UniProtKB/Swiss-Prot annotation:
Organism whose genome encodes this protein: Spinacia oleracea
Designated name of the protein: ATP synthase subunit a, chloroplastic
Key words of the record: ATP synthesis, CF(0), Chloroplast, Hydrogen ion transport, Ion transport, Membrane, Plastid, Thylakoid, Transmembrane, Transmembrane helix, Transport
Pfam hit, one: ATP-synt_A
UniProt subunit comment: F-type ATPases have 2 components, CF(1) - the catalytic core - and CF(0) - the membrane proton channel. CF(1) has five subunits: alpha(3), beta(3), gamma(1), delta(1), epsilon(1). CF(0) has four main subunits: a, b, b' and c.
Membrane topology designation: Multi-pass membrane protein
Transmembrane intervals: 38-58, 95-115, 134-154, 199-219, 220-240
Molecular function per GO: proton-transporting ATP synthase activity, rotational mechanism
Gene Ontology cellular component list: chloroplast thylakoid membrane; plasma membrane; proton-transporting ATP synthase complex
Length: 247
């Protein structure tokens, strides 16, 4: 009985820690679950922007691209280059995944600076970039983990797990730990940079509302784009490692 109560108490403690929040959040109650409504709202807006832009740009494709079609073809070529550089000759099936990651993160990051989220009033909390929430970045990182496991298992089958004892079985714990640190580093890097950028802008606007925050906002747009590129590049690199079967 004592052993059972001892095992339950730590679980309660972990559950309490997981409920710790930074700021206020707007929740939707669905069944027995609480869902961050503000994250879903902003994510849907970003997805609508991406789908709407793509539909408008390619609604009447031309042999010689112009305007929006030309821009989207340039973006596609850029994503192909990133995928091919990191993955190798087997990059083609992974272009849609890498492209989706890059575009969603890029538009999400920029939406925090360019879209007037503050205009929309919520009962609790406020709207912000989807990548400003740790839930979004963790979900993206876990999708990346699933992708590179799928890539390795599809190509090598169960032999994929042989990489954990290469070049020597002594490295087994370190190789296993690496698979846990990859999604952690991806998610916290993106979340930390976007949150810090928005906090700096908010503080500067409150202290010096004119002129001074503008250069910081432009710097934030630049770093937001870089963060999207870093995430997509690392995702492609992890997939490439799984396909090659070495570190």
């Amino acid at each position: 009985m004592n052993v059972l109560s001892y095992s339950i108490n730590p679980l309660k403690g972990l559950y309490a820690i997981s409920g710790v929040e930074v700021g206020q959040h707007f929740y939707w109650q669905i069944g027995g679950f609480q869902i961050h409504g503000q994250v879903l709202i902003t994510s849907w807006v970003v997805i609508a922007i991406l789908l709407g832009s793509a539909a408008i740009a390619v609604r009447s494709p031309q042999t010689i691209p112009t305007g929006g079609q030309n821009f989207f073809e340039y973006v596609l070529e850029f994503i192909r280059d990133v995928s091919k550089t990191q993955i190798g000759e087997e990059y083609r099936p992974w272009v849609p995944f890498i492209g989706t990651m890059f575009l969603f993160i890029f538009v999400s990051n920029w939406s925090g600076a360019l879209l007037p989220w503050k205009i929309i009033q919520l009962p609790h909390g406020e709207l912000a970039a989807p990548t400003n929430d740790i839930n979004t970045t963790v979900a993206l990182a876990l999708l990346t983990s699933v992708a590179y496991f799928y890539a390795g298992l599809t190509k090598k089958g169960l032999g994929y797990f042989g990489k954990y004892i290469q070049p020597t079985p002594i490295l087994l714990p370190i190789n296993i730990l690496e698979d846990f640190t990859k999604p952690l580093s991806l998610s916290f890097r993106l979340f930390g940079n976007i949150l810090a950028d928005e906090l700096v802008v908010v503080v500067l606007v409150s202290l010096v509302p004119l002129v001074v925050p503008i250069p910081v906002m432009f710097l934030g747009l630049f770093t937001s784009g870089i963060q999207a590129l870093i995430f997509a590049t690392l995702a492609a690199a992890y997939i490439g490692e799984s396909l090659e079967g070495h570190h």
